[in-house]
From Swiss-Prot:
Belongs to the UPF0178 family. InterPro entries: UPF0178. This is UPF0178 protein Swol_1505. Pfam families: DUF188. PANTHER family: UPF0178 PROTEIN YAII.
Amino acid sequence: MKIIVDADACPRPVLQSCLELGHKYDVPVWTVASFNHHIESDHHIVVGNASQEADLKVINLTQRGDMVITQDWGLAAMVLGKGARCLSPIGREYRNENMDFLLEEREIKAKLRRAGGRTKGPRKRSVEDNLRFQRSLEKLLLAIPPHPHP
């Protein structure tokens, strides 16, 4: 098992929590980001700046039982299909049961924006968001039976 972080748009406190909890539970943490981001990590993969390049690398790295951290609903759906667990930076676990709704909502908002409409962006990140993420990740790490990693 490994933690894979879609680090292109990952808040620093989330990345820090992943690194700390990965160390605490002896789970390797892989970060994937374009060359525009400076990430300090033992296992960092730099990708180009092309559209979806980081997402494709995350998908290719992901194996059954891994934990993926992303705010991209499309990427979340893909890694769930590979048997991974997936958590948002605000600590919400993505599940197969809620992906259809999230992807439909994303499509509706995209259509509205293409038609010239506006959609509400995410609210400002709070300290509570950071704590919720850390608690959620630790809870999921504790629930996964340990097995050796390569």
